[in-house]
A protein has these predicted regions:
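Internal amphipathic alpha-helical repeat/solenoid segments
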Residues: 1, 15-17, 30
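Hydrophobic residues within the alpha-helices of tandem HEAT/HEAT-like
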Residues: 4-15, 34-37, 52-61, 74-79, ...
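Structured alpha-helical bundle/scaffold domains in large eukaryotic membrane-trafficking regulators
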Residues: 20, 46, 64-68, 83, ...
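Long, hydrophobic, well-ordered secondary-structure blocks that form the structural core
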Residues: 21-82
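Core helices of alpha-solenoid repeat scaffolds
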Residues: 22-32, 64-72, 88-91, 106-118, ...
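Short inter-helical turns and helix N-cap capping residues of alpha-solenoid HEAT/ARM repeat scaffolds
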Residues: 41-42, 84, 127, 163-164, ...
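Eukaryotic acidic, Ser/Thr-rich intrinsically disordered low-complexity regions
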Residues: 200-201, 234-345
Length: 345
């Protein structure tokens, strides 16, 4: 197929091809079938397709709106229907070039695209495969309109992965990137969820996730938020970090926890000390494995009841398949004494 794509590229780039001829050929049906080719496993083929589509968008001005709509529909199909789409990274590359050309202030349709596509693409299970391109699009949008950073953080916290440590690390990196441009007038509404997520990541059994979460305490803006909103931050962060500083099994991370604990204590010692005794602290982050097992079993029983009721109400209903099963569940807390570990081949 590559010679065919090369021929199409030459036709599109040829100066003697009249615009009206291209308009007749480049229809909605053509674009729909063309975008389906991005499903190819072969990366060089997808690269050819990307270059052709980019050239078409640049040359065929009357069809730009249609091309954007068809690409958006492809993204929506991935978000709401599919688990994986091999050409997502290439389409995001094209979108990055398009976003760079958006005028400021952004039009309403562009803001809607950011919220319904760019933010929503984070929740796709295979997002790790195109995360670099997605991050580039996100930051380009935010450079055009910094107020969108709040919506991005809300989306990251809402779609935070729970069974994919590589994806979780990338989410932390993106959250770190966007932190400095958050709108100061709207940041307070995000803080409880933000601090809780950081605390969860610090207590993660995966070392890379925990280490990445600790880098937030090297960020001056993040520390300024803790100082300014210490009544919110310390009751959430102090109990978790204090316990891990005493019990974490990894020596280097334990040293980092001790350093962070001292930073939090220096911010306001009385508030820090009272936070360790505060009954409203997020104890679910530091529960023992027996308590966590009981909580998990109660939730699984609840889901089983809901599943049974759904099947009684709608026979033949197709239930979603979770991205994990009990056989691959390794740990519920940070520690080596978990008696619920199951190893399989």
């Amino acid at each position: 197929m590559l010679p065919v794509y090369e021929l199409i590229m030459q036709i599109v780039m040829h100066d003697t091809i009249e615009m009206k001829i291209l308009k007749v050929v480049i229809t909605q049906k053509f674009l729909g079938e063309f975008l389906q080719l991005f499903e190819s496993w072969y990366a060089p083929e997808r690269e050819y397709l990307k270059n052709i589509l980019h050239r078409l968008y640049a040359k065929l001005v009357p069809r730009r709106k249609l091309i954007r709509k068809m690409v958006t529909d492809t993204f929506h199909s991935l978000i709401h229907e599919k688990v994986k789409f091999h050409g997502c990274a290439e389409l995001l590359d094209i979108n990055a070039a398009v976003i760079s050309g958006f005028a400021v202030p952004l039009r309403e349709e562009h803001v809607h695209f950011f919220n319904s596509v760019i933010v929503a693409l984070h929740k796709v299970q295979s997002a790790g495969e195109y995360h670099n391109e997605l991050l580039r699009c996100s930051m380009l949008f935010i450079s055009k309109d910094p107020s969108l950073a709040v919506e991005l953080v809300k989306g990251l916290l809402r779609f935070w992965p729970f069974a994919n440590y590589q994806k979780e690390t990338k989410f932390l990196q993106e959250l770190y990137e966007v932190l400095d441009v958050l709108d100061a007038s709207r940041v307070q509404e995000l803080l409880p969820s933000l601090f809780k997520q950081i605390a969860k990541c610090i207590s993660s059994p995966h070392l890379q996730v925990a280490d990445q979460a600790l880098t937030f305490f090297e960020n001056d803006y993040f520390l300024s938020l803790i100082r300014k909103y210490k009544q919110i931050a310390l009751p959430i962060l102090a109990p978790v970090i204090s316990q891990l500083a005493d019990t974490h099994w990894h020596k280097l991370l334990q040293d980092s926890m001790i350093a962070v604990r001292q930073i939090l204590k220096d911010i306001d010692t009385p508030v820090f000390e009272s936070s360790l005794k505060n009954l409203q602290s997020p104890g679910y982050l530091i529960l023992d494995c027996e308590t966590l097992r009981k909580i998990r079993n109660a939730k699984e029983t609840q889901w089983s009841d809901l599943t049974r009721k759904a099947q009684q109400r709608t026979p033949g209903v197709q239930l979603p398949i979770p991205p994990y099963n009990p056989a691959v569940r390794a740990s519920d807390f940070n520690g080596l004494n978990n008696r619920d570990i199951i190893l399989v081949d």
